[in-house]
Amino acid sequence: GLFKTLIKGAGKMLGHVAKEFLGSQGEPES
C-alpha cells in the first residue's frame, strides 16, 4: 500500500544520503 511505498522511498533516500556522507568521509573498506 501507500505506507509501504513511503517506507521504500524513505529508505532509498536515506541510503543515498548515507552513501553521499560516507563518500565524503572516504570509501569504507569492505
Curated annotation (Swiss-Prot):
Tissue: Expressed by the skin glands.
Disulphide bridges, residue numbers: none
Superkingdom, natural source: Eukaryota
UniProtKB keywords: Amphibian defense peptide, Antimicrobial, Secreted
Any GO BP annotation: defense response
One GO cellular component, as annotated: extracellular region
Entry's localization field: Secreted
UniProt keyword annotation of Secreted present: yes
Coiled coil stretches, renumbered: none
Similarity comment: family membership: Belongs to the frog skin active peptide (FSAP) family. Dermaseptin subfamily.
Task performed by this protein: Has antimicrobial activity.
Protein name: Dermaseptin-3.3TR
Organism, scientific name: Phyllomedusa trinitatis
